[in-house]
């Protein structure tokens, strides 16, 4: 009888643990999608108002602009007039929100802008921004091309059809792996749809007909057009399973002893790249790029990938 009672007690305890685990998984996040995008709304309004005090910052907040640590008032700029293009992704479980935006300035110029916020306990603990103006990423510049937000970036995918958290990261990592190995015997193709569209600071580089020839994202890797590039300091700070979009932040450098295959890819860069993924394959890519020498830090710890120079 004691054994039966003991077994029953264990079963009840296990059932309790299972219910507890289920409750944790199904628990409402402290800050849901609307809440997190609300923090982004507040940030962008404070930017155009140039009023840092309106942003609910934690006392220990970490702020970077193009890899340089600074206070938020140093990361804002006086000329920001209004946001003319913006879309967001979130991770409710981890309190992350990231935005790609185009900011119209008072002088009529435009700024490409990526903002990543971490929210904990109702306060922003991390602010990471990448900001590029015309000429700061060579010829990659066409923010006027970004008007209506692509439907591929705004989906609400039903749970049964969603790629997993790590599945989204795997798709993005396949892209960097293809970039890293293209033109070599170790080349491994990326998980790209044949008609994948890529936008770099607004310039559409693939998924369109150019000079009578279709520009294919997979073909660029297949033909080794980016041989020698080193994709390092890789991070995946925001993963949105409902939207099917993952943000990766990386460094574009060169492998030791290699030269760029193209004048357009000569400079080292800090890049925020958003990947829209469907059933494990990349459908659309949006990147904010800023020229940053490999020797300069980003202020954040890498998660994966080779080191500087490809080591």
Predicted segment positions?
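Gram-negative bacterial Sec-dependent N-terminal signal peptides
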Residues: 2-21
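C-terminal and inter-domain tail/linker signature
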Residues: 22-311
């Amino acid at each position: 009888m004691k054994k039966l009672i003991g077994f029953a007690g264990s079963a009840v305890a296990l059932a309790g643990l299972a219910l507890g685990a289920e409750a944790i998984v199904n628990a409402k996040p402290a800050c849901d999608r609307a809440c997190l995008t609300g923090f982004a709304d507040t940030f962008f309004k404070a930017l155009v108002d140039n009023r840092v005090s309106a942003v609910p910052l934690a006392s220990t907040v970490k702020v970077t602009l193009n890899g340089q640590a600074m206070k938020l008032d140093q990361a804002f700029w006086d000329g920001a007039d209004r946001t003319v293009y913006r879309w967001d992704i979130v991770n409710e479980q981890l309190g992350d929100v990231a935005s790609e935006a185009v900011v119209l300035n008072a002088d009529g110029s435009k700024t490409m802008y990526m903002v990543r916020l971490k929210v904990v306990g109702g306060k922003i603990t991390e602010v990471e921004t990448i900001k590029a103006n015309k000429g700061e990423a060579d010829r990659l510049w066409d923010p006027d091309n970004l008007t209506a937000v692509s439907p591929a970036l705004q989906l609400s995918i039903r749970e049964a059809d969603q790629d997993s958290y790590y599945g989204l990261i795997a798709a993005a990592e396949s892209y960097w792996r293809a970039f890293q190995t293209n033109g070599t015997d170790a080349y491994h193709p990326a998980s790209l749809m044949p008609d994948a569209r890529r936008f770099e600071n607004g310039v559409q580089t693939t998924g369109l007909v150019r000079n009578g020839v279709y520009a294919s994202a997979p073909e660029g890797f297949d033909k080794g057009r980016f041989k020698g590039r080193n994709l390092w300091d890789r991070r995946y700070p925001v993963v949105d399973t409902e939207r099917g979009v993952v943000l990766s932040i990386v460094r574009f450098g060169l492998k030791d002893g290699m030269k760029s295959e193209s004048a357009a890819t000569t400079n080292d860069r800090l890049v925020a790249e958003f990947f829209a993924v469907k059933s494990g394959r990349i459908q659309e890519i949006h990147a904010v790029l800023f020229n940053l020498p490999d020797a300069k830090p980003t202020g954040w710890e890498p998660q994966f990938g080779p080191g500087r120079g490809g080591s």
